[in-house]
Amino acid sequence: MNPTLILAAFCLGIASATLTFDHSLEAQWTKWKAMHNRLYGMNEEGWRRAVWEKNMKMIELHNQEYREGKHSFTMAMNAFGDMTSEEFRQVMNGFQNRKPRKGKVFQEPLFYEAPRSVDWREKGYVTPVKNQGQCGSCWAFSATGALEGQMFRKTGRLISLSEQNLVDCSGPQGNEGCNGGLMDYAFQYVQDNGGLDSEESYPYEATEESCKYNPKYSVANDTGFVDIPKQEKALMKAVATVGPISVAIDAGHESFLFYKEGIYFEPDCSSEDMDHGVLVVGYGFESTESDNNKYWLVKNSWGEEWGMGGYVKMAKDRRNHCGIASAASYPTV
């Protein structure tokens, strides 16, 4: 596996005295700042606006090319508009692609033909979209999502689980709170600890604090975890037969940061260098089934305003696009 991803801060190198702005965007900039409660210091506002304008024009160009048939998805300005992609990766993406896998190996069911489409939201397996905030805890949200689904499968009750419990307490298993972690380490913590508290009893704070796990409020447990072979065919069978699956993807692209809707396909996406943990809750296709219109239905942890109500359709069966099948796993309960 690759060593821990080390992200460096990005230096804009823009002197405030030389900044020039597109005055036709003045009203949109003012509205965006108000919508997202942005208050800047005198020296910061200029270069933040420069970043925002650069992102806005990149989005407009992409959407124009979409209308010309050059892309399969649209983009939109969102809460990340004043951040560079380098800043965003440093703060938000927290999957650490570094260790050999130690779970049981998923055994594909023999003679099983997976359905053409699956959506576990329709079966009650999936909690509402959550928001990790400015904390590299994506791994915790991916892990709770998979465990929430398996607990529902076992008990018939869907209970939101505590990401904060994982952020604060799974350090001994190898996780690093807001600085990143692995879903398998989270599953290992739950097994070692003998339980995981509910979201209601141990709410999310978007910062690492001292461990406050209380067995009185534990509502989930697992007996280990299963790692899925690095093939989309195996992932498809796992999603169809097991439920929502934790996966990691390469999300380090502006196209993903500002994704709005459609099937996400990024030519520069890596199938090996993943930096973001998410949850596959199904798969399907748009219009008629063909090579370029199949997708994985993926739950993100950036709030409901991002993407399609917090979800993204990732290109499916296109050479393991963005590494979606490279680190897939789920807990056993």
From Swiss-Prot:
UniProt membrane topology term: Peripheral membrane protein
Keyword annotations from UniProtKB, A to Z: Cell membrane, Cytoplasmic vesicle, Disulfide bond, Glycoprotein, Host-virus interaction, Hydrolase, Lysosome, Membrane, Nucleus, Protease, Secreted, Signal, Thiol protease, Zymogen
Location of this chain's protein in the cell: Lysosome; Apical cell membrane; Cytoplasmic vesicle, Secretory vesicle, Chromaffin granule; Secreted, Extracellular space
EC number(s) from the headed UniProt entry: 3.4.22.15
Glycan-modified residues: N221
SMART domains: Inhibitor_I29, Pept_C1
Notes on how activity is controlled: Inhibited by the propeptide produced by autocleavage. Long isoform of CD74/Ii chain stabilizes the conformation of mature CTSL by binding to its active site and serving as a chaperone to help maintain a pool of mature enzyme in endocytic compartments and extracellular space of APCs. IFNG enhances the conversion into the CTSL mature and active form. Inhibited by CST6. Inhibited by the glycopeptide antibiotic teicoplanin. Inhibited by amantadine.
Binding site for Zn(2+) 6: D273
Sequence positions that bind Zn(2+) 4: E205, E209
Posttranslational mods: During export along the endocytic pathway, pro-CTSL undergoes several proteolytic cleavages to generate the CTSL single-chain and two-chain mature forms, composed of a heavy chain linked to a light chain by disulfide bonds. Autocleavage; produces the single-chain CTSL after cleavage of the propeptide. The cleavage can be intermolecular.
GO CC, alphabetical: apical plasma membrane; chromaffin granule; collagen-containing extracellular matrix; endocytic vesicle lumen; endolysosome lumen; extracellular exosome; extracellular region; extracellular space
Catalysed reaction, written as an equation: Specificity close to that of papain. As compared to cathepsin B, cathepsin L exhibits higher activity toward protein substrates, but has little activity on Z-Arg-Arg-NHMec, and no peptidyl-dipeptidase activity
Keyword set includes Protease: yes
Pro-sequence residue ranges: 18-113, 289-291
Signal peptide start-end: 1-17
Disulfide cross-links: C135-C178, C169-C211, C269-C322
Binding site residues for Zn(2+) 3: D184, D227
Record-annotated active site: C138, H276, N300
Residues the record lists as binding Zn(2+) 1: E122
Its biological purpose: Thiol protease important for the overall degradation of proteins in lysosomes. Plays a critical for normal cellular functions such as general protein turnover, antigen processing and bone remodeling. Involved in the solubilization of cross-linked TG/thyroglobulin and in the subsequent release of thyroid hormone thyroxine (T4) by limited proteolysis of TG/thyroglobulin in the thyroid follicle lumen. In neuroendocrine chromaffin cells secretory vesicles, catalyzes the prohormone proenkephalin processing to the active enkephalin peptide neurotransmitter.
Subunit and partners: Dimer of a heavy and a light chain linked by disulfide bonds. Interacts with Long isoform of CD74/Ii chain; the interaction stabilizes the conformation of mature CTSL.
Family: Belongs to the peptidase C1 family.
Protein name as it appears in the record: Procathepsin L
Native source organism of the sequence: Homo sapiens
Organism ancestry: Eukaryota, Metazoa, Chordata, Craniata, Vertebrata
Protein encoded by which gene: CTSL
